[in-house]
């Protein structure tokens, strides 16, 4: 592993390990990106995937919110679709639609189009971006790496793009359960190597995004999500036992107890999950992250501060990482993001004194 500057602010990592801190650490999913004018200026000159695939540009965009706000982490500017790309599928970023696959996997026979990638070669730009970013951060805050989860990536690979129901992908689970498991396992193997290499390249915490976990029945989650999520955590921890792992299984309320029994250190909650109930279920088995409604950032600052106080009261002063229940939205006012970040720090400090 490369040599990096020492870390000045380790509040996030200490919280993820269950250690006490002076206040609640905070970062925001999609904190780097479309709502920031400085990002928009870069996008006028470069396409989305050009930014992702150019380490210096990815590093610049990753650091932009750290320069602007008092965040406790940077998260690499990248995209979960780099894994399906590495496996041989073509991904296009279409304005107004997001990622699309011109040739999705419509039948199990089409899995023959997939390749077993040389992860180091196929995703080398990601690893280089992590290394460049880690050096440019100069120890200000830790750097988070991430990947999409096997089911969420499969949903896109089969559906061909975004969908409200992902019925084509879910149809696979019922019509082709064995092929679905084979696809999930192949994707899992790539993700594991990808995440391990991210740590080697400079990532100090890792998050797995299972954005469409909540589309499953509890039984299908246990069959088509949980085993692969658990395997990822176990295998990555075997390689890097000291690196905190976060799981974000959006919408899977019923899965909290099972996820708490895996090797993930942190469970990220979406905005529909009740922090008190989650704490009762999880106990001290995992730290919780989240979960302010992103739309609360549209509120006037005084209302937003009250929403933050309410969120923090639900989680309590310890074993909590402040975040949103999903990502920043393109039309968010950056100054309201500042209010959110500062309010988490200020009110959580106050909570520790009473």
UniProtKB/Swiss-Prot annotation:
It is found in: Cytoplasm. Pathway: Porphyrin-containing compound metabolism; protoporphyrin-IX biosynthesis; coproporphyrinogen-III from 5-aminolevulinate: step 4/4. The keyword Lipid metabolism does not apply. InterPro entries: UROD/MetE-like_sf (IPR038071), Uroporphyrinogen_deCO2ase_HemE (IPR006361), Uroporphyrinogen_deCOase (IPR000257). Pfam families: URO-D. It catalyses: uroporphyrinogen III + 4 H(+) = coproporphyrinogen III + 4 CO2. GO terms for molecular function: uroporphyrinogen decarboxylase activity. Substrate binds at residues 30-34, 49, 79, 156, 211, 326. GO terms for cellular component: cytosol. This is Uroporphyrinogen decarboxylase. The gene is hemE.
């Amino acid at each position: 592993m490369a040599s990096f500057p020492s870390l000045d602010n380790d509040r996030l990592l200490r919280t993820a390990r269950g250690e006490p801190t002076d206040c609640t650490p905070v970062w925001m999913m999609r904190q780097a990106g479309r709502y920031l004018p400085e990002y928009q200026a870069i996008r006028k000159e470069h396409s989305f995937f050009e930014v992702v695939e150019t380490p210096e540009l990815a590093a610049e965009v990753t650091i932009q919110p750290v320069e602007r706000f008092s965040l406790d982490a940077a998260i690499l500017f990248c995209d979960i679709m780099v894994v399906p790309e590495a496996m041989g599928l073509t991904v296009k970023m279409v304005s107004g639609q997001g990622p699309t696959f011109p040739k999705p996997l419509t039948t199990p026979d089409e899995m023959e189009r997939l390749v077993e990638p040389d992860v180091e070669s196929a995703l080398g730009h990601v690893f280089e971006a992590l290394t460049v970013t880690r050096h440019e951060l100069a120890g200000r805050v830790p750097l988070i790496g991430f990947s999409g989860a096997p089911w969420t990536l499969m949903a896109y690979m089969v559906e061909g793009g975004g969908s409200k129901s992902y019925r084509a992908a879910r149809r696979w689970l019922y019509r082709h359960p064995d092929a679905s498991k084979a696809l999930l396992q192949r994707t899992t193997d790539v993700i594991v190597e990808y995440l391990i290499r991210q740590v080697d390249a400079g990532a100090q915490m890792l998050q797995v995004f299972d954005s469409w976990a909540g589309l499953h029945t509890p039984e299908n989650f246990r069959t088509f999500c949980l085993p692969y999520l658990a395997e990822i955590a176990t295998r990555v921890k075997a390689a890097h036992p000291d690196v905190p792992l976060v799981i974000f299984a959006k919408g899977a309320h019923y899965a909290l107890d099972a996820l708490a029994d895996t090797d993930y250190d942190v469970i990220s909650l979406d905005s529909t999950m009740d922090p008190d109930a989650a704490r009762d279920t999880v106990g001290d088995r995992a730290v919780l992250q989240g979960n302010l409604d992103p739309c609360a950032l549209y509120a006037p600052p005084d209302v937003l501060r009250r929403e933050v106080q309410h969120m923090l009261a639900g989680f309590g002063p310890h074993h909590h990482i402040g975040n949103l229940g999903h990502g920043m939205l393109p039309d968010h006012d950056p100054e309201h993001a500042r209010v959110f970040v500062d309010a988490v720090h200020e009110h959580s400090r106050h909570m520790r004194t009473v």
